[in-house]
Structures are given as C-alpha cells and as structure tokens.
Amino acid sequence: MSVFINKDTRVIVQGITGSTALFHTKQMLEYGTNIVGGVTPGKGGTEAEGVPVFNTVAEAVQTTGANASVIYVPAPFAADAIMEAVDAELDLVICITEHIPVLDMVKVKRFMEGKKTRLIGPNCPGVITPEECKIGIMPGYIHKKGHVGVVSRSGTLTYEAVHQLSEAGVGQSTAVGIGGDPVNGTNFIDVLKAFNEDPDTHAVIMIGEIGGTAEEEAAEWVKANMTKPVVGFIGGKTAPPGKRMGHAGAIISGGKGTADEKIKTLNACGIEVAETPSVMGETLIKVLKEKNLFETCKTH
C-alpha cells in the first residue's frame, strides 16, 4: 500500500515539450513511472520521449485512460492548466510550477470546490512511492521502499530526511511535497489522514517552516486522531520577521508563524521535533526504537 500514487497510476505530463518537462519526463520514465501521454496545445500528434502528445487534457484522458497529471507549465498559464485537468476529471493533479500568482490560486481553489480532483502543490517537488511511481522532480535514487511516510512544505528538506532514513536502512511508504505557497491544494492534515489510514505506513516525518498556522493545526489533529508516531522539523528558526524566506508562504507576519511558536505547539501535542535538519532521520529512529517499531520499519 501507499498513498495517492502506486505502480498502476497512469500519468500525463502537461507542458511536456518544454525543456524542464522533457528532462523530468525522461527521469520519471527511467524510474518506472507509467507515463501514458503529454499535453502541449498545438503539438498534438507528435511524440516527446516516446510518449504521445495531445492538444488537450480531455483528449489525452480519453485516449490513454490517464488518472493523474503532472504540470510543468509556466506560471502565467499554470492555473488554467490545473483547471483544465480538473475539468477532465482526473483523480490527482500535481503542480510543480513556482511563482503562480496567489489570486490565480484562489480562483483555482474556488473552481475545484465540489470536484473529485485532488491537487498537490503548486510549488512542490511532487510525490513518490518508492520503487513504484515517481511524479515530480525529486531524485529517485535516494528513496527506498518501506514504512515511513514523509510530508513536507520544502522540497530539499524532504530529500534530506529521505536520504537520512534510507542511509539508516529505513524505507518510505510515500513522500509527499505539499509545496511552499500560501494557497495550495493539499495540506498537512489531508496527507496525515491518508498516512493514518494506510496500513503500510507505520510512522511519519512532518517537515514544516515559518509562516501561517498549518503546522499548528496539523499538530492539534495529530494529538486528537493520529494512531502512529509523528516526528517534526520546522525550518526558519533564525528568520527575521517580515522577510519572505525562499517560499511565498514562509513569512512571519504580525508576530505569528514563528518557528518557536510552531515547535512549542508540536511538542505540546506529543510530536518530537528535530533540532536541526541533520538529525531528522536520527530523531525518527529514536522514536521508532522507543515504540518498538524500528525493526518493522527497517528495509530487509
């Protein structure tokens, strides 16, 4: 088991003929992801990396039976690309694109109300179920199949946590990058719920950062509902107030959203928080050992 994606996920790539999309399409295919088509308006009938290209998402879905899409469309056109995928009734849309205007995403969120599609991102590294399916831009080779779920607002911190776990012989069920923008499709709680219900996930690492209250809300949810151990990390301890730190959502405003505040809430909700990024894996392994879960989480 895993969450959101597996070896049977049938993927289309929106914006497939762009250089970034072509590079990552090749990487995803090499990993074993089942990419069944691509979409670039005006390029229908051609091929990219051996994958058929269509003019519209609807046409691609109708022809290939795709149930998921990954979007590498430039920011000014990305919101339209998401809505086109939602209109085509895909189960899952993963948007990698950064710098989508916030107002565009507000419109997308409203458009998606009551629709069946789950959006992950934007401004995210994607989702990977190790040794089955990789959708996005993460380096596949650092992942190992196993029982730890990873959910994060940061791409590179996800890779850091995953690499530490894999090096210690602890595999992952699924790693989900929810993205660093203030308005996104899937939040921490959505992913934690999925991990909680997944029999193959035995523990979770949640990686947050300054800005907003998503981590605090997730911690309260964990305290009330989670049956599996969760370990946390919060980036941005030394960030000055009022300065955006890399991600559009990573900003301390009005004294709210500081790392200290978040860490305090996580601790109060029973979530052990790693002091620095370099001990994220170590902190989880310590908790696994305390709960006698380490052996079941080791990849044999």
From Swiss-Prot:
Give binding positions for CoA.
T17, G18, S19, T20, K43, I96, T97, E98
**EC number(s)?**
6.2.1.5
Which SUPFAM superfamilies does this UniProt record tie to the protein? Answer: NAD(P)-binding Rossmann-fold domains, Succinyl-CoA synthetase domains
One GO MF annotation is:
succinate-CoA ligase (ADP-forming) activity
Provide a GO CC annotation, any one.
succinate-CoA ligase complex (ADP-forming)
InterPro entries to which the protein is assigned, alphabetical: Cit_synth/succinyl-CoA_lig_AS, Citrt_syn/SCS-alpha_CS, CoA-bd, CoA_lig_alpha, NAD(P)-bd_dom_sf, SUCC_ACL_C, Succinyl-CoA_synth-like
Please name the top-level EC class of this enzyme. ligase
- Record's keyword annotation contains Cell wall biogenesis/degradation: no
Pfam families, per database record: CoA_binding (PF02629), Ligase_CoA (PF00549)
State where substrate binds.
Y159
Single Gene Ontology BP term?
A: tricarboxylic acid cycle
Q: What does this protein do?
A: Succinyl-CoA synthetase functions in the citric acid cycle (TCA), coupling the hydrolysis of succinyl-CoA to the synthesis of either ATP or GTP and thus represents the only step of substrate-level phosphorylation in the TCA. The alpha subunit of the enzyme binds the substrates coenzyme A and phosphate, while succinate binding and nucleotide specificity is provided by the beta subunit.
In the record, the note on similarity to other proteins reads: Belongs to the succinate/malate CoA ligase alpha subunit family.
Record's subunit section: Heterotetramer of two alpha and two beta subunits.
Protein name listed in UniProt:
Succinate--CoA ligase [ADP-forming] subunit alpha
Q: What gene is behind this protein?
A: sucD
